[in-house]
Design a protein with these regions (language model features):
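Phosphate/ribose-phosphate-bearing ligand recognition and processing surfaces
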Residues: 12, 107-197
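Glycine-/small-residue-enriched capping loops at alpha/beta junctions
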Residues: 2-4, 11-132
Length: 197
């Protein structure tokens, strides 16, 4: 099956397609459809669960690619996990990225439980950690928009708005890259980026 083709019921995927980017001050916000575990950036964000013990989706893919040292480090440094809306950092282990920023986004409950503020906080916590670590490039997945059920359109809007607000201030981060697996999610992020313009 050619790249980008999908059988009925499967997610459409185009590997490593970048077609949307904006510049804010000295920084850029990019959209890529691809594999976050292959990103050659200083730090990648992980859509983690509060226990920080690995899981499915992006979290599972990052744990598999990083190797067992990632889980061992999480167990040692963060035995009690971290609350929703926060992030913690580990080494990248076997990943191309130097660091992994484990962000805990909210489970979607219809938008009545402060999900928007918690999602923005998860993204902002990663960006703050990246700055503390000296990272100049950060790649994000679509936090909470998988099994946690956050709708992609409002979720993408929160993600790109939070990144744009952050890089508009004082930061050493020069590249914020959203690495999105499905074409639908990529399109929602492109819509969110267009709304900034």
């Amino acid at each position: 099956m050619p790249a980008g083709a999908a059988a009925t019921g499967q997610v459409r995927y185009r590997p490593e397609v970048t077609s949307t980017a904006i510049t804010i001050g000295a920084s850029s916000i990019e959209l890529v459809q691809g594999d976050i575990t292959r990103q050659a950036v200083d730090a990648i964000a992980n859509a983690a669960n509060a226990a920080l013990r690995g899981g499915g989706g992006v979290d599972g893919a990052i744990h598999r690619a990083a190797g067992p040292g990632l889980l061992a480090e999480l167990r040692e440094r963060y035995p009690d996990g971290t609350p929703t809306g926060t992030a913690v950092a580990t080494a990248g282990h076997n990943l191309p990225a130097r660091w992994v920023l484990h962000a805990v986004g909210p489970v979607w409950s219809g938008g009545t439980e402060g999900e928007e503020a918690l999602l923005a906080s998860a993204y902002r916590s990663c960006l703050e950690l990246a700055d503390e670590l000296g990272a100049t490039s950060v790649a994000f997945p679509a936090i909470s928009m998988g099994i946690y059920g956050y709708p992609p359109h409002p979720g993408a809007r929160v993600a790109v708005r939070t990144a744009a607000e952050y890089v508009a201030g004082e930061t050493q981060i020069r590249v914020v890259r959203f690495v999105l697996f499905s074409e639908e999610t990529y399109e929602r992020f492109a819509d969110g980026l267009a709304e900034l313009g």
